[in-house]
Design a protein with these regions (language model features):
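A charged N-terminal "starter" segment
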Residues: 1-115, 121-135, 150, 165
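Active-site loop/helix belt of alpha/beta enzymes
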Residues: 130, 144-168
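ATP-grasp fold ATP-binding core
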Residues: 136-142
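Generic structural motif
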Residues: 57, 142-144
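Short secondary-structure boundary segments
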Residues: 120-121, 141
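Residues in well-ordered beta-strands of folded domains
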Residues: 97, 140, 168
């Protein structure tokens, strides 16, 4: 499958006439198709949901498109939580995964009913003290161990020592 740009050079030149540079152009059709593709690929897994990392592209229009395609958001800060809330994400639409989390961030995640993903089990007491324990709580897990280095058909290398990684 040959990957072609969604925007021709001529189209880009036309846009430049009306829009100051630099600027970003997004492919809504491509974004929707990719969201549908990933949801279809994991449709065998009842309850699967893709959570888009807001930090990757904190653009309300893109977040709204992903919401319409059934995706949730993965937030790591108060700002990302507030942006997601403004875009209509609440409750299980939000996965909150944060390091060295300030109290205000944790309170907001709890207030929104987000799935809260903790770095380790010791954070449970902190969460309980500052916000309370939600109905669902998650904890990152690093399986450790050593695995033989391999390569996928696409040429991607597989990590061989998850114990060396922050979260496996």
């Amino acid at each position: 499958m040959e990957k072609r740009p969604f925007l021709t050079e001529e189209q880009a030149q036309e846009i430049i006439q009306d829009v100051p540079t630099p600027f970003h152009v997004y492919d809504e059709k491509g974004i929707r198709e990719n969201a549908r593709r990933i949801n279809k690929a994991f449709s065998w897994n009842k309850g699967f949901r893709e959570y888009f990392a807001v930090k990757a592209l904190p653009n309300p229009i893109i977040l709204q498109i992903l919401k319409e395609e059934g995706c949730g958001v993965d937030c790591s800060s108060l700002t990302e939580l507030m942006l997601s809330e403004a875009c209509g994400f609440t409750g299980s639409d939000i996965m909150f995964s944060s390091n060295q989390t300030p109290v205000e961030d944790m309170k907001k995640a709890y207030e929104l009913g987000a799935y809260i993903n903790l770095d380790d089990a010791t954070m449970v007491d902190f969460l309980d003290r500052v916000a309370g324990i939600p109905e669902n709580i998650f904890c990152r897990y690093n399986p450790g161990g050593t695995f033989q280095l391999g390569e996928s058909e696409e040429g991607f290398q597989v990590m061989d020592k998850p114990g060396d990684a922050k979260y496996g």
